[in-house]
């Protein structure tokens, strides 16, 4: 779909957003698609960390992926962090400090990796917010994201 959009409207900017568990899918997807930026919002960046921190999701992960020790290859295929490289688009990490669904250490882990490989990134850590920001914080988040995407577009012109 992104390729079709880019073919029909080559000058259009495409910004991809991955929220929560969609964060890891987005990290895996944008490597193959011509996107101008990626926003990971309250997102999982490492499936191993998700397995460790979310005891309530272990059953689902074992059914869908397998056990991390017995099915290492299946987990490695879903390791989005390893797919990141210097050609990755700019990434904005948005995460709440009180997020109980996806711990903020997922964001810190991703930030460390992006810094290590030299990918352009920015962070918006809202230390008093949970998985979904409260209305006033949500409004500020959306303003920040809009400003960030606009800056990405200006820099690409």
Feature map (PLM): residue ranges:
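Primarily recognizes the serine-hydrolase "nucleophile elbow" in alpha/beta-hydrolase
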Residues: 3-53
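Conserved alpha/beta-hydrolase "acid-adjacent" motif
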Residues: 100-106
